[in-house]
């Protein structure tokens, strides 16, 4: 099983080295920031997306969804597509359809299943998907993806603590917008530091931790790597287009 990151930057990240958040694992797209569709095509994974999990409605996590849906129309998709999201996505999609932003309503071509709610659950391919509300400046859902063989937890954006009582995951994909020296700023803006992400992975008994949603303050990336590995050695600061074996 492979985990591929298409965007690993925070919404404030300047430049193209780290694009807006998105990652792919076995048919599931985790968030859909700007640029995700092109990178899915580059990796020959666009046609393998069966479900999209949107953590929250800040534009860096959802702005690429309209490009994705447009491409499903252009390519004549016939297979169902499931989108899981917190409340609020359906009126955005309706407005986009009213404006003909995707050329035509995708649901005219295929079954578009929108599973929207405060704690939605879904089954997508082999995955059992459970949403877990996490603390951010807007309503944010973390997602636990489970099969009989593995559990993956993806946080979206959150301030510490991220781990819900009793939650367990083999692999944790955790945001780390700030280094520890900016912990107060992280809390103010609803984000996490590297050490906080490491603590969440420890609490979830994770085997491996991936950090994403990296900020671009001077020195942040090097500090984040040092700080997370000091607390949780089997950690990786994900890179755009990075592919990792699970």
Language-model-derived ranges and their functions:
Residues 160-245:
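Cap/insert and terminal regions of metallo-dependent hydrolase folds
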